[in-house]
Amino acid sequence: MATKLFPKFSQGLAQDPTTRRIWFGLAVAHDFESHDGMTEENLYQKIFASHFGQLAIIFLWTSGNLFHVAWQGNFEQWGADPIHVRPIAHAIWDPHFGQPAVEAFTRGGASGPVNISTSGLYQWWYTIGMRTNQDLYVGSVFLALVSAIFLFAGWLHLQPSFQPSLSWFKDAESRLNHHLSGLFGVSSLAWTGHLVHVAIPESRGKHVGWDNFLTQLPHPQGLTPFWTGNWAAYAQNPDSASHIFGTSDGAGEAILTFLGGFHPQTQSLWLTDMAHHHLAIAVLFIVAGHMYRTNFGIGHRMSAILDAHVAPSGRLGAGHKGLFETVNNSLHFQLGLALASVGTICSLVAQHMYSLPPYAFLANDFTTQAALYTHHQYIAGFIMCGAFAHGAIFWIRDYDPEQNKGNVLSRMLDHKEAIISHLSWVSLFLGFHTLGLYVHNDVMLAFGTPEKQILIEPVFAQWIQAAHGKAFYGFDLLLSSSSSSASSASQTLWLPGWLDAINNNQNSLFLTIGPGDFLVHHAIALGLHTTTLILVKGALDARGSKLMPDKKDFGYSFPCDGPGRGGTCDISAYDAFYLAVFWMLNTIGWVTFYWHWKHLTLWQGNVSQFDESSTYLMGWLRDYLWLNSSQLINGYNPFGMNSLSVWAWMFLAGHLVYATGFMFLISWRGYWQELIETLVWAHEKTPLANLVYWKDKPVALSIVQARLVGLAHFSVGYVFTYAAFVIASTSGKFG
């Protein structure tokens, strides 16, 4: 008999008489493949419709950002003096605030308590040509409408007559063409248009709005140079080095340039360089979007490209044969590829936002730079771990050995021992040597003989920096040598700006590196290789191992295979993912510690502190963590409070959540079952409480679920603790 209980998508679970019904129901709510009566076509349709919901949420969120800044922020005041005014994210209304708290949080020229924005939104909006609260309100309303349209589109595509067919979802060539040309190409072209028609004129003090955008020419010669082939005209007369952003002082006329380096006043990339970059990207991607064969029988078939990829030496077996069908029929494979790409891009965003700041005055807002770097690195870590999780699910659910005989996929499985053992060897080598150097240096400092430290100059990295034009090290080669052909070739184009930027100590482009950087670089390499080892081993052993050849029959996550098969605990692909996330967090901890400490000393003008203290572990613990958390911990104390108090509280709360994680990670199923049964007994024996009964028999979480709960608390607590530390220690010093 069908039951109406949760979960509706699984009658088997809905009829479970224990609390397992709830926990397992939550666990598989998004595992659409496993739901009752799910067909492949319906699966694709459900996921497709959910994408519209996702986009609606994103647009609503961005609309909210615009709305709150327009309503409660100080965008216009900030635009008048971006260096000295602190940008306001939104007002705070908190009935717990006493007078000291009200005063502490009233800043940025506001009349009451506010939060300061550390997202970089003010800098972005200002750079792209927004100047008034009115601009922000209009953008907010527009995005709210877009959000509503996407919600409607999601609903519409669930209606039978508007549900695309399975063949439409599997038409890879059409999808690639549209995504390359439309998503990347045309959107980049549109962005170039916005930069050229709105942002660049605004940066030169000319307002372009809905009232005059059709009459205000972005370039005095209009389209004439385009039609006559005199494209160089668009690069002539760029903004001068004395240009004051947002005014006509020192402004030029060029719209597409290749100046290199930064705008001296805003310390951000030249807007005209960025317009040129987006135009080039647009052309490339629009061309790329015409590569695959669809309607007119011209262009390439993807399956033909892949089938032709067979190494002539024969050493790679069947090469890419069979990959098209495998990838096109596996959502997990596609998701794995997408997550790996997006994760990598997200990490690249973190690196480039500070080294090549694209937004005006972003380089002057240290707290925002620290927040953006940390945010993008953590997000990248989680996303990239997800890539391997779905890769493992692909091996278990979607991989067909017959279809992939002898190709690169089957060869990965065939020599997985070599792959895993090499990763293991690299991790061991990096771990022992790096830790050995750090510990040796610690001991030397403890014994009062710092001169006996082992300090290794990163000569190869310095050589690479010199090749790119950094003169500090005295390597006379390539771009750091004025006589090299590399230097002379681009001297008139982008080099003057680039060389000026790379040799300027006020920015973060190619920071000077030494022995401390060498050590932490290898510590990070250790973390990356160990994380990769655990994830790759989990995926490559997901179908089976010598110990458990039939592992794939047990699915992605299983606790233990019962009595008589000892040693099958902890070896599911999920267990590998679970372990890898700890290593990922560990690694990103080292990455962000390094970035943050290096920059704190750079911004404070005492780089020697990092250089001298980063070569031994006590230096990191004492001069980075301890020294920089003291202000934060004193956000409130017996003598009062200041504006860091919220971060002090979050720092404590983060530690609490993090510590809760260990409770689930260390004590497993039996402990919880006994505890629950004791609580149930107490409940039943207590007057009043015994009037309340529940139908489900309480059953403790399985070890797989307890690990998820533990991991979630560990991760959330870890991120909250460090986020509070980064923002408080940076804003406490620089405001």
UniProtKB/Swiss-Prot annotation:
GO molecular function, one term: 4 iron, 4 sulfur cluster binding
Keyword hit for Transport: yes
Name of the featured protein: Photosystem I P700 chlorophyll a apoprotein A2
Reactions catalysed, as given in the entry: reduced [plastocyanin] + hnu + oxidized [2Fe-2S]-[ferredoxin] = oxidized [plastocyanin] + reduced [2Fe-2S]-[ferredoxin]
Domain of life: Eukaryota
Record-stated family: Belongs to the PsaA/PsaB family.
Binding site for phylloquinone: W672
Transmembrane parts of this sequence: 47-70, 136-159, 176-200, 274-292, 331-354, 370-396, 418-440, 518-536, 576-597, 644-666, 708-728
Sorted UniProt keywords: 4Fe-4S, Chlorophyll, Chloroplast, Chromophore, Electron transport, Iron, Iron-sulfur, Magnesium, Membrane, Metal-binding, Oxidoreductase, Photosynthesis, Photosystem I, Plastid, Thylakoid, Transmembrane, Transmembrane helix, Transport
Subunit relationships: The PsaA/B heterodimer binds the P700 chlorophyll special pair and subsequent electron acceptors. PSI consists of a core antenna complex that captures photons, and an electron transfer chain that converts photonic excitation into a charge separation. The eukaryotic PSI reaction center is composed of at least 11 subunits.
Entries under Pfam families matching the protein: PsaA_PsaB
Residues at which chlorophyll a B1 binds: H655
Compartments reported by the entry: Plastid, Chloroplast thylakoid membrane
EC number of this enzyme: 1.97.1.12
Residues noted as binding chlorophyll a B3 in the record, renumbered to the chain: M663, Y671
Record membrane topology: Multi-pass membrane protein
